[in-house]
Amino acid sequence: YIVTWGLGHLVTLADPEDYDKKYKEWKLEDLPLQPEPFRLEVIRQTAKQYQAVKAQIHRKDVGEIIIATDAGREGELVARLILKKAGADKPLKRLWISSVTDKAIREGFASLKSGKEYEPLYDAAMCRAEADWLVGINATRALTCKYNAQLSCGRVQTPTLAMIAKREEQIKNFVPKPYYGLRASVKGISFVWQEQKTGNTSSFDKKKMEELQKRLSGHPMQVTAVKRTVKRTPPPLLYDLTELQREASRRFDYSAKETLNIMQRLYENHKVLTYPRTDSRYLSADILPTLTERLRACAVGPYRGLAGRLAKSPLPEKPFFVNEGKVSDHHAII
């Protein structure tokens, strides 16, 4: 095999001025811009790597191309845009794996899929990219020209911003209001009043609660029923990017960007963290046998005792955090 790689996207949709130089100047009368067909351009910052990949694609001793990018929509798009721009016309296979253990890679190569099976995924990715272009380019230019200010608009960005603005407005307009409840402590046991019909344990009606307190004061309490239930609280799921950013914000007051930067260094430079930009909180089954070795690697410094004990414990046969169906492009962060 000859192995080459991208650096994220090497090819993207062309800018408006690449279709016609007049579009370099933003004018309302030019809108909407609707390229047909859309053109592709090589990203300038990574053009050298694109040329390196293109050279491998067109080698005479290469008879087949295997796409081995992330097992997801965006990973498919990364590879397909490179192949389309490079004019690749060789038979296409797909390596579809979400884990990079030796076992997963070997099994993936032993069961390569036809590239045709993933053409609908590529079509979906292109649809998303073109929708982003059409909304982003046209709406951003329209807003900027209309209001003579640099305004940005996006298919995902703008609805998300609207949600934040709506929530901020609710917080600003919130008027605190006192509420009342009843609590009694008898022989070390705490009792909380609960309304029979609604189940509410508090009320905004101060007079109602004061009257209830007067009626109950001085009267003996009678226990009419006792219900005991055993509840099992499952351990938390493993981290994905968002959950780890939340945890770091809560514990250390890190911003989302700070957390991602730290994770990226741990992943790229120190090789002690798996791929950080994942949205999955589960592991694939092939990762399970590697956990003991990973725990031993963590048995240093203050973690020596706990990690060492866990490493000696047998792995569960069907752990809750292993679920092939819920692993997306990448498994959870470990």
Functional labels for PLM-detected ranges:
Residues 118, 122-123, 134-136, 262, ...:
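Extended, highly charged linker/hinge segments and catalytic-adjacent loops that couple domains
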Residues 2, 63-66, 91-94, 258-265, ...:
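Beta-sheet entry/capping signal
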Residues 42-53, 71-82, 101-105, 123-131, ...:
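Helical mechanochemical/support elements of P-loop NTPase systems and associated helical scaffolds
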Residues 1-129, 133, 316-318:
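Intrinsically disordered, low-complexity regulatory segments
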Residues 69, 246-248, 277:
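Short glycine-centered, acidic/aromatic-flanked micro-motifs in structured strand/loop junctions
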Residues 143-150:
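Short, solvent-exposed helix-loop connector elements
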Residues 2-44, 55, 151-268, 297-301, ...:
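Long, highly charged, low-complexity internal segments
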Residues 83, 87, 110-114, 135, ...:
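Hydrophobic/aromatic-lined pockets within catalytic cores
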